[in-house]
């Protein structure tokens, strides 16, 4: 099973890349995540935000394969505990399909991406800096895996 984090935004600060890589390398080979970075659409005072979101959505939809489980991160999504995430991870492994996790740009995900998602998750009711979401998400996936392995990291 492959987990793809499909994220809008490139050229992240070094701390984001370092944090992401630290947790990604800790995951076992069968769960090694793939980070797909998509360019952020140009935004200015004269551009329409909805057009930028739609452009990012077009790009994101091209990376969603058939017969995959797709999860969209959205402020209106469902929130849950790390323990519940660990059970979801176990279920994904049993299911065998690849998993896509969609991380939108600063203005969120295109409605077509949300419509294609099997699940919508909210990481927090707080507004999080866009780059931090990648690090937070990969850490939580690692933590969920450690729970399944009875590894002391979670304790």
UniProtKB/Swiss-Prot annotation:
Record-stated family: Belongs to the RNA methyltransferase RlmH family.
UniProt protein name: Ribosomal RNA large subunit methyltransferase H
Gene Ontology CC: one annotated term: cytoplasm
Any one GO molecular function term: rRNA (pseudouridine-N3-)-methyltransferase activity
Gene that specifies this protein: rlmH
Catalytic activity as recorded in UniProt: pseudouridine(1915) in 23S rRNA + S-adenosyl-L-methionine = N(3)-methylpseudouridine(1915) in 23S rRNA + S-adenosyl-L-homocysteine + H(+)
Known EC number: 2.1.1.177
Any single Pfam family the record assigns to this protein: SPOUT_MTase
Enzymatic class: transferase
Domain of life, source organism: Bacteria
Biological role stated in the UniProt entry: Specifically methylates the pseudouridine at position 1915 (m3Psi1915) in 23S rRNA.
Family annotation (SUPFAM superfamilies): alpha/beta knot
Localisation: Cytoplasm
Subunit composition and interactions: Homodimer.
Keyword annotations from UniProtKB, A to Z: Cytoplasm, Methyltransferase, rRNA processing, S-adenosyl-L-methionine, Transferase
Annotated positions binding S-adenosyl-L-methionine: 73, 104, 123-128
């Amino acid at each position: 099973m492959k987990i793809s984090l499909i994220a809008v935004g490139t050229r992240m600060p070094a701390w984001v890349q370092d944090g992401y890589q630290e947790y990604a390398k800790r995951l076992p080979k069968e769960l090694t995540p793939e980070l797909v970075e998509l360019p952020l659409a140009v935004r200015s005072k004269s551009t329409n935000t909805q057009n930028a979101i739609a452009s990012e959505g077009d790009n994101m939809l091209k990376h969603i394969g058939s017969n995959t489980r797709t999860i969209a991160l959205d402020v209106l999504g469902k929130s849950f505990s790390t323990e519940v995430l660990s059970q979801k991870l176990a279920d994904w492994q049993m299911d065998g399909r690849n998993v896509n996790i969609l991380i939108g740009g600063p203005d969120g995900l295109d409605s077509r991406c949300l419509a294609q998602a099997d699940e919508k998750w909210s990481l927090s009711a707080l507004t999080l800096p866009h780059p931090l979401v990648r690090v937070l998400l990969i850490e939580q996936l690692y933590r969920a895996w450690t729970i399944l392995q009875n590894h002391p990291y979670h304790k």
